[in-house]
Amino acid sequence: EETGVKNIIFHPKFLPSIVILDPVLTVGLPPKMTAATGMDALAHNLEAYCAPGFHPMADGIALEGMRLINKWLLEAVNNGSNIEARMNMITAASMGSTAFQKGLGAIHSLSHPVNAVNNIHHGLSNAIFMPYVLTFNKDVIEDKIIKICDYLELKDRSFDGFINWVLDLRKKLNMPHKLSEVIEEKDFQLDRLSKMALEDPSTGGNPKKLTEADMKIMYQHSMSGTLF
């Protein structure tokens, strides 16, 4: 809160000996928070899969994580007492955090600064930034996105079909389309946020090499609601 910076702290000794995923503990999570954390899990799996580099295990985990989210997120939001839906969502979330050892990308780079400076929920900001970052990266991720469409068995198995799936999912979850719906223009520090986004640890995992100008234009598109 004092610095306005979201830091990542990690050490091998932080790793637990065992992890128990108990869906019963998530039953009381309100629908809005279930939606936001579910979109966060989607962002983890999606960016891990699109990150450059060779990591077939992470790719496989990420694909299956996205399939589970596609099947179970809306049910978990609309019927929070459905233990099967909760179990599959907590599993998908765990899979995403396993897969992103491969890398993340600009969705997270843009999110972390607004989380720290503007106090916007991380999953909510990831959901907002997702289609803008995807369309910005289109020329280098289109083949991977089509593979995701095939695995999820989407009706329209194209890049635009995937974008429409993301937009439709957000709409069904009652999530905002534009960053300006959650941050007022007067509170939006474009230069500061863009610099922070470029310096974010997630930036190195983006499929395209990014500049501060790239961060600015992605923020601007996210504020206006204009896809690339």
Feature map (PLM): residue ranges:
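Carboxylate- and glycine-rich phosphate/diphosphate-binding segment that chelates Mg2+/Mn2+
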Residues: E1-K102, A213
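A ubiquitous short alpha-helical element
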Residues: L29-P31, G53-A58, P131-V133, D160-F162, ...
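Alpha-helical scaffold segments in soluble metabolic enzymes
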Residues: A41-A48, G60, E64-E75, N88-T91, ...
